[in-house]
């Protein structure tokens, strides 16, 4: 029986095809709706803003600081084009890797959604890298993505052999469609020779960055891991090795949980945790790097509103990436965030994000110094007391 089509985008990638054809009532597939990309902006990609939302990251201009993170919403060129139509400043594809067919993603369970009082707060995924080969991206998908009008920030895999990483940089670079690279050394559920296993090892990280940087003709940024490492130390190594900018950071290595009726795990391996619940963790890591390492930063983790974007910028980020919010709410969420951000900038009278970048960092101190400050005491307003205690 042929499934009924819904107005969704039918991807060429075989493992997303079934998801793209399913009903949009399933939260996981809402990102594929063409309508959702246009839901807030009518003529997509032509939204007029009152404030100047442009930023310059690593010497490259973005029309605004919002960037589609390397994840499911950038599965292929068409998905990236939709994000561009919704107004996004930059697009990053699923991480591009080997020339040969890449292994299928694990399919022994569903992406696991965590809720609190019925409201989604996070999700665990086991997606790896792009299931399309390097040649497919080079021959077709990057050209489609370029039509987004957004800055092309291309995610590439740090291969086990740094020389292969350098060849990957050259292959993608020769398309002429790359504005920046983002080296993925941080996937939380990779094979033992790639992903976070490189990113948490300073010596391996240094070799990878030096190899990629040696052939890159555009800015070369690195997406770091928040897992099992001193991120300030790793960020320092990355800068010294030649990185032009850093993305802080990839998802949190996690476990979905156990079905107590059967005793079996919901997902039988460790995955990456994303969504609003990780934002305080990433804000800490972003602020620590911003206070200690002088390098352009891109913040990512749990971003879903204009307030989140502003917070990340006030903690030192130049661009701010999002993913899960688009998966849950559609590409129209991009335009909503940008409209709200524009209104906030206009209301506050800011002419540029340069006026607010990093302004919160000066007030961050140690627990010991907090203890020296005058204590605060609660005052009870008896007229508003509900007698709850």
Language-model segment annotations:
Residues 103-115, 257-271, 327-348:
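C-terminal helical cap(s) of enzyme catalytic domains, especially alpha/beta-barrels
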Residues 368-389:
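Ferredoxin-like iron-sulfur electron-transfer modules
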Residues 122-123, 188-203, 234-291, 295:
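Glycine/Thr-rich beta-alpha phosphate-binding loop at enzyme active sites
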Residues 73, 155-159, 224-229, 295-307:
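Glycine-rich beta-to-alpha transition loops that act as phosphate-gripper elements at the mouths
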Residues 46-153, 157-162, 166:
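N-terminal capping/small domains of soluble enzymes
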Residues 134-139, 143-148, 200-220, 267-295, ...:
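Alpha-helix-loop-beta-strand connector modules within alpha/beta enzyme cores
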Residues 79-80, 167-171, 229-240, 303-320:
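Catalytic cores of alpha/beta
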Residues 93-98, 185-187, 248-254, 302-303, ...:
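Glycine-rich phosphate-binding active-site loops on the catalytic face of alpha/beta enzymes
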